[in-house]
């Protein structure tokens, strides 16, 4: 039996975004094990050229529908760094809380929209409405709670 193995998964499914996995084993030794992120460029930097610094957080929040808060906060931090502004401890803590909300929200979407269909043997989330309505209700309830938390933290969910 050969001790050489090459694995190339050129399109990962059930993930947020696009990625590949590359694994190479030579003479029984792992040589390469790599996750490749293959997102297409979206050129948001070009959208920001010539715009007011105040527009950047709003524009960058549209980079991703899953992690809008992270992109918004990165934009705000870049502006603060450029202007030499140091946020207060309270602001920093609120931002961390917002990122924790977003992580929870992302996990809910991942588990219920991307993983649950595979666990019950259906091709997507939609068939779960009939086959597992309790799972769908739980997913919607958790998503609604996350949206309400975001409303409390920043005035609206993104």
What does each model-found stretch correspond to?
Residues 2-158:
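Catalytic cofactor-binding cores of redox enzymes
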């Amino acid at each position: 039996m050969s001790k050489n193995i090459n694995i190339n998964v050129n399109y990962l499914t059930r993930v947020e975004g696009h990625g590949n996995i590359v694994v190479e084993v030579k003479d029984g030794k792992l040589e390469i094990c790599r996750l490749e992120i293959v997102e297409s460029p979206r050129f948001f930097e070009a959208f920001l050229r010539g715009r007011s610094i105040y527009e950047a957080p709003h524009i960058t929040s549209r980079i991703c529908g899953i992690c809008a808060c992270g992109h918004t906060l990165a934009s705000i931090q870049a502006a603060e760094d450029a202007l030499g502004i140091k946020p207060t401890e309270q602001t920093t803590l609120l931002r961390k809380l917002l990122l924790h909300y977003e992580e929870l929200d992302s996990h809910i979407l991942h588990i219920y929209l991307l993983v649950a269909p595979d666990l019950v043997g259906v091709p997507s989330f939609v068939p779960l409405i009939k086959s597992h309505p309790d799972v769908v209700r739980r997913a919607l309830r958790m998503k609604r709670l996350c949206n309400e938390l975001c409303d409390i933290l920043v005035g609206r969910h993104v």
